[in-house]
Curated annotation (Swiss-Prot):
CDD domains reported for this sequence: Thr-synth_1 (cd01563)
Pathway membership: Amino-acid biosynthesis; L-threonine biosynthesis; L-threonine from L-aspartate: step 5/5
Enzyme class: lyase
Residues with N6-(pyridoxal phosphate)lysine modification: 59
UniProt entry keywords in alphabetical sequence: Amino-acid biosynthesis, Lyase, Pyridoxal phosphate, Threonine biosynthesis
Role summary: Catalyzes the gamma-elimination of phosphate from L-phosphohomoserine and the beta-addition of water to produce L-threonine.
Family in the record: Belongs to the threonine synthase family.
Protein's name in the database: Threonine synthase
Binding site for pyridoxal 5'-phosphate: 85, 185-189, 314
Source superkingdom: Bacteria
Catalytic activity, as annotated: O-phospho-L-homoserine + H2O = L-threonine + phosphate
Cofactor: pyridoxal 5'-phosphate
């Protein structure tokens, strides 16, 4: 029986006899063959569906490690800045270990589905003026001066936990893919995947993939080469204008012979709808930066026909239900409560 990440990959993680045995059964997420989109693009495309994690995003991988180590080291409280997914994950694992969780969010810039999770898990939530980068600056200063552990991706234990997704992909494919496509926000995850692939190459002899990272155009600090003071994109999970792991992300792309590129909101929304309507997979907008990037790079020839590609789908579509409604035409038929009229309407739908 699967026992969670800290047990599954203990030999690759900084755990010892003092590390709390904590898990919400994070990890072990499906690698879904995206058969219909594969046919359209001429590649072997898979989606690593991180929305299947306990709080609905990849953050659980790093958070179980970071919060467990915080508890091991005697901390009774954790703090983070968040656009949503980090807050949900931090609050869940803090609740599991009986710790206090303080979350600082940018006012009015967090999806309701994510905020609802943090509230349900009992976190203390503080809203401040500004954007995510302002919130991160604040919590870094507080954690440096107060007895509270910072659990944003600048915490190295987060990277240790998140690298396990690379292990899983290799285990599921029995090799690494040719290309890993991944959204880039604060840039911790791309860093973690590269670390994981490098470790598995040394341990098991698997090849390393080319890493293609994708920022949202309105928050593409790395691609544009400068901090974006007021980042704006429909993809709230990657609406970050000054990535904390900027240099590590660039290293991952360069060392893997990949690149970091950007995709527009229009490309993200196209991928978002395509994934749901042709594959039955519902991932939040930020997740679809990876798929949008795959489409862009196949069309430009940067991803070759026939290559094996894994697109990391970082979060569940239920995280941001407002976008699901606003980006699709909500056409609800109004029919009287008469069985024949209902049947006639259904026949019309089937025949259309």
């Amino acid at each position: 029986m699967y026992k969670g990440l800290l047990k599954q990959y203990a030999s690759y993680l900084p755990v010892n006899e003092k590390t709390p045995d904590v898990s919400l059964m994070e990890g072990n997420t499906p690698l879904i063959p995206l058969l219909n989109i594969s046919k359209q693009l001429g590649v072997q495309l898979y989606g690593k569906y991180e929305g299947a994690n306990p709080t609905g995003s990849f953050k659980d991988r790093g958070m179980v490690m970071a919060v467990a180590k915080a508890k091991e080291e005697g901390s009774e409280a954790i703090i983070c800045a968040s656009t949503g997914n980090t807050s949900a994950s931090a609050a869940a694992y803090a609740a599991r270990l009986g710790m206090k969780c303080i979350i600082v969010i940018p006012e009015g810039k967090i999806a309701h589905g994510k905020l609802a999770q943090a509230v349900a898990y009992g976190a203390e939530i503080i809203s401040i003026e500004g954007n995510f980068d302002d919130a991160l600056k604040a919590v870094r200063n507080i954690a440096a001066e107060e007895p509270i552990t910072l659990v944003n991706s600048v915490n190295p234990y987060r990277i240790e936990g998140q690298k396990t997704a690379a292990f899983e992909i290799c285990d599921q494919l029995q090799n690494a893919p040719d290309v890993l496509a991944i959204p880039v926000g604060n840039a911790g995850n791309i860093t973690a995947y590269w670390k994981g692939f490098c470790e598995y190459e040394k341990e098991k002899g698997y090849k390393k993939p080319r890493i293609h990272g994708f920022e949202a155009e309105g928050a593409a600090a790395i691609v544009k080469g400068h901090v974006i003071e007021e980042p704006e994109t429909i993809a709230t999970a990657i609406r970050i204008g000054n990535p904390a792991s900027w240099s590590y992300a660039v290293e991952a792309a360069e060392q893997s012979h990949g690149e970091i590129d950007m995709v527009s909101d229009e490309e993200i929304l196209h991928a978002y709808r395509l994934l749901a309507k042709t594959e039955g997979v519902f991932a939040e907008p930020g997740s679809n930066a990876s798929l949008a990037g795959v489409i862009k790079h196949v069309e430009s020839g940067k991803i070759k026909k026939g290559e094996t590609v894994v697109a990391v789908l970082t979060g569940n579509g239920l995280k941001d239900p407002d976008i699901a409604i606003s980006s699709n035409q909500l056409d609800i038929a109004s029919v009287s409560n008469d069985i024949e009229q209902i049947k006639d309407h259904i026949k019309g739908v089937i025949m259309s």
